[in-house]
């Protein structure tokens, strides 16, 4: 008897839910001695330990976990916003016309007030969603 394996294609919402669950469980990756030095406390980005006796590097019990590939989100939703749209950085009105369905505009931080206002008006005409519409 031959059994057929039926795989149903899962939608984007399914993978977004999985990513949300994984992110809840993911620890905050802190560098070595983050609690000792004020500079490390204020800028707690991950740095791998290089010392000979570094307990983080040796992955000793009781020490924080280092970042590993297992903590990554599903490939289909990697780089997407929580609403499932892909962010596209916009610098001017012309770039706004190149946005496709399934993408959301993000106005670049260096765009001034006047140009930002023009982009917002054009986006309203074309009914394109904008992630950071605040003036």
Swiss-Prot record:
GO aspect biological process, one term: translation
UniProt key word Transcription regulation: no
Residue intervals passing through the bilayer: none
CC annotations in GO: cytosolic large ribosomal subunit
CDD domains the record matches: Ribosomal_L32_L32e (cd00513)
InterPro entries: Ribosomal_eL32, Ribosomal_eL32_arc, Ribosomal_eL32_sf
Alphabetical UniProt keywords: Ribonucleoprotein, Ribosomal protein
Pfam family for this entry, one: Ribosomal_L32e
SUPFAM superfamilies: Ribosomal protein L32e
Any one GO MF annotation of this record: structural constituent of ribosome
Stretch list, region Disordered: 51-77
Recorded family membership: Belongs to the eukaryotic ribosomal protein eL32 family.
Record's protein name: Large ribosomal subunit protein eL32
Source organism of the structure: Nanoarchaeum equitans (strain Kin4-M)
Gene that produces this protein: rpl32e
């Amino acid at each position: 008897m031959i059994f057929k394996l039926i795989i149903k294609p899962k939608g984007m919402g399914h993978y977004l839910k999985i990513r949300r669950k994984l992110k809840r469980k993911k620890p905050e990756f802190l560098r070595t001695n983050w609690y000792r030095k004020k500079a490390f406390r204020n800028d707690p980005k991950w740095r791998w330990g290089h010392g000979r006796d570094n307990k983080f590097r040796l992955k000793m019990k009781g020490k924080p976990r280092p970042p590993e590939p297992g903590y990554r989100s599903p490939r289909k939703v990697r780089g997407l916003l929580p609403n499932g749209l892909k962010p596209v950085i916009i610098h001017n009105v012309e770039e706004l016309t190149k946005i496709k369905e399934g993408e959301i505009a993000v106005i670049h931080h260096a765009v001034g007030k006047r140009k930002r206002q023009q982009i917002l008006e054009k986006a309203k005409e074309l009914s394109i969603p904008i992630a950071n519409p605040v003036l």
